[in-house]
UniProtKB/Swiss-Prot annotation:
Belongs to the prokaryotic/mitochondrial release factor family. Methylated by PrmC. Methylation increases the termination efficiency of RF1. It comes from Yersinia pseudotuberculosis serotype I (strain IP32953). Keywords: Cytoplasm, Methylation, Protein biosynthesis. Pfam families: PCRF, RF-1. Signal peptide: none annotated. It is found in: Cytoplasm. The keyword Cytoplasm applies. The gene is prfA. One of its GO terms (cellular component) is cytoplasm. HAMAP family: Rel_fac_1. Peptide chain release factor 1 directs the termination of translation in response to the peptide chain termination codons UAG and UAA. This is Peptide chain release factor 1.
Amino acid sequence: MKSSIVAKLEALQERHEEVLAYLGDASVIADQDRFRALSREYAQLTDVTRCFKEWRSAQDDIEAAEMMLDDLEMREMAQEELKIAKARSEELEQQLQVLLLPKDPDDERDCFLEIRAGTGGDEAAIFAGDMFRMYSRYAETRRWKVEIMSASEGEHGGYKEVIAKISGDGVFGQLKFESGGHRVQRVPETESQGRIHTSACTVAVMPAIPEAELPEINAGDLRIDTFRSSGAGGQHVNTTDSAIRITHIPTGIVVECQDERSQHKNKAKAMSVLGARIRAAEMQKRQLAEASERRNLLGTGDRSDRNRTYNFPQGRVTDHRINLTLYRLDEVMEGKLDMLIQPIVQEYQADQLSALSEQD
């Protein structure tokens, strides 16, 4: 391992001890925001320092085994020990490289999850509902909170569009690779001939940014319309114009919110989603520029992005970005998403490592 990397790891080890001391300080404990931030940093540093200690232990084992090679009686055993220690050292070095990759500052944030029905009419809306249920189940397994911000229900079930805020530890970092197009192949309940139909929906995952960090939105750039809240089939939820539609004129971004009875609450929710969408659009531009010369696994939420196909007759789900196919569709739809998320996270990390080595 490069001496510069070892020096960086030694500095992180010192920081780990420093943060531990802070966490025992009464003034830090009294400041909940600082205590929470330091606790997160401590957890991240703990993984790095543990791995670094194990790597150093492997180096000691290599050194000891090499010294034993000169002893004829011990040589065979020493060669075996050297082989094991070197393999362990290489494995730990790879783990350390991943742990040292630049962290996306948004990874620890909550997120907004948007699911929109695409081609396929009623079946697309039903599939969007199935997708929302899948993500909600996944959130339950990770003890995350799901709050619907806005929903437009389909006439025969599901959603034309649903926006939810998902809160918890590391939500955006875990879900950000879900952005893009999702396609379903199955026989709709309304299909009398038993023919397989293809429908689609798009998913967009955006970090939920605190109000103070959101891009400044000029009030003159907004058109705000109020209308009467309605449920599926036009049935009125209430008789006041409490629903809000906000249009950001420069970008054409439109956000509707009608889930709350209070117009003020609907406007606050809509503004938070609008701010996240504007920021996400800016980030997307930047990502496209940076990724022009290499593939980008981070979906843009664009309809042209084809992330996955969910084939119900075959019980198959395929992630087209990494050519991964699993015949475990029932489990996936019940929210067991780690089997799909982890491989793409690993692929993304491998791409990052490759990009860093090219810079070196």
